[in-house]
Amino acid sequence: MQPTLQDLLATGADSATAISAPSRSGLSFGALRTLIADTLASLNSLGIGRNDRVAIVLTNGPEMATCFMACASGVASAPLNPAYRADEFEFYLADLNAKALIVEQGSHSPAIAVAVKLGVRLIDLVVADGAPAGLFTLQPRDAAGAAAAVNATDGKHGTAGGFAQLDDISMVLHTSGTTSRPKIVPLSQRNLAASAGNIRQTLGFSATDCGLNIMPLFHIHGLIAGVLAPLAAGSQVFCTPGFNALKFFAWMDEARPTWYTAVPTMHQAIVSRAAKNADVIARHPLRFLRSSSSSMPPQVIKELEAHFHAPLIEAYGMTEASHQMCCNPLPPALRKPGTVGLAAGPEVAIMGADGSLLPRGTALEHTGEIVIRGANVTAGYENNPGANADGFKHGWFRTGDQGVMDEDGYISITGRLKEIINRGGEKVSPREVDEILMDHAAVAQVVCFGMPHPKLGEEVAACVVLREGQSVTERELQAFVARRAADYKVPKKILFMAEIPKGATGKLQRIGLAAKLGLG
């Protein structure tokens, strides 16, 4: 029988360290399991149970990791980017139908005022002075409408308590869509546990491993690969406050890790400081380095492996797959740099435009859309029949990535079939930015698109046509977007044009626009 998260987290020895953090004592697996049970009991006492949505807005670190694990074990956790602006929080909290919001005690997040406005129950996460890394208690606020805060749900969400069952929803994330409205991706216990188990097996985690987590813990990458998968093997996870190239090697010296996972932009920043920190690398040799979320330049792979004397393992994941789909194997098995490796859990295939599965090979006729199916794949987007009709074909989930599978089964991504901008692993819906810019009084027409960037892979750009007689600067429009959207969504370059280039049918075409404008 497939395990639940509770089963996976039962692996580590009671006295072994599960969670650690800079300059703090560690939290044992026994204490972690007690914390999870206590947290669920606390939530249940507030009328919050299985499948109820609990939004989490916390800074990166050990409490974010343990709060996620506790919530995902018995309710539907909904981690949100703490850098969101009020408008974004209002959209996400309302769209999720959140029953509660967990924030740090003393936080001034704009999410708090939004939660009060929406009648979402506020719960403070309290960390005692000198507490081990990740240990906390929950304390409900006496917010106005406390009675209403045991929010009546829409009838779909129950209030059954205790640990979740396999088909209960454990995490709810949004993924950027080609339309302006982000799509809700519900992930079940089955999905998360399957993905964590796949990653654990692929990377050969054991109780002797320690992972240095620098990934944000409101993304699927950090939560599943950085935290849940290693803990499922009884490994230790060293939780940092978030990526900081200047502190990385000091953290490495303290944590004594055996591995870390990151996106290519982080790896590039790390490798630029590796030579100066050769002594740290020598003291704490890594078993491997892992990269996912966007493609890694081959030159950076060579540099990293030369400095760390360890293999860099490229993986391929996405939210709808609870992260990992493919991964290059560990030595001595064959690694193929530049590919995203072999199927690593789910079934992976290449589908032609007619819906047929294509044979292996790297020739043009073998190029198609990468599709997946398996226990880690979401059952479908919530309340979005159109997206589900488009996203699934013959039982396979369509990734939107174009690729090939060579004779050995290794997958190479050759392009994108969708308009989503991948900015260093942060996914941006161009339509969302379009709509913000269109609210500016001076803007008549706009189209946002991705333009190449040497480190991030892609950066956000926009073409703008102004209303007759109006004027505005690039900096003013960037500031306008920044007031309503997270910084990574703000266009780096804005081109003012008399007319936006269109395709043969007269439609605005984002894909390929950067090249047409000489930006790529």
Task: List each language-model region with its residue ranges.
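Conserved pre-ATP/AMP-binding loop-to-beta segment of ANL
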Residues: 14-15, 142-174, 181, 204-210
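Conserved AMP-binding A3 loop
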Residues: 26-30, 163, 170-194
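Conserved AMP-binding/adenylate-forming
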Residues: 41-87, 96, 105
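AMP-binding/adenylate-forming catalytic core of the ANL superfamily
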Residues: 84, 260, 374, 379-380, ...
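Conserved AMP-binding/adenylation subdomain of ANL enzymes
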Residues: 193-210, 220-258, 269-276
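Gly/Ser/Thr-rich phosphate-binding loop
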Residues: 257-262, 271-335, 347-349, 354, ...
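Conserved ATP/PPi-binding loop(s) of AMP-dependent carboxylate-activating enzymes
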Residues: 342-345, 356-390, 428
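Conserved beta-loop-beta connector loops within the AMP-binding
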Residues: 349-371, 407-408, 470-474, 509
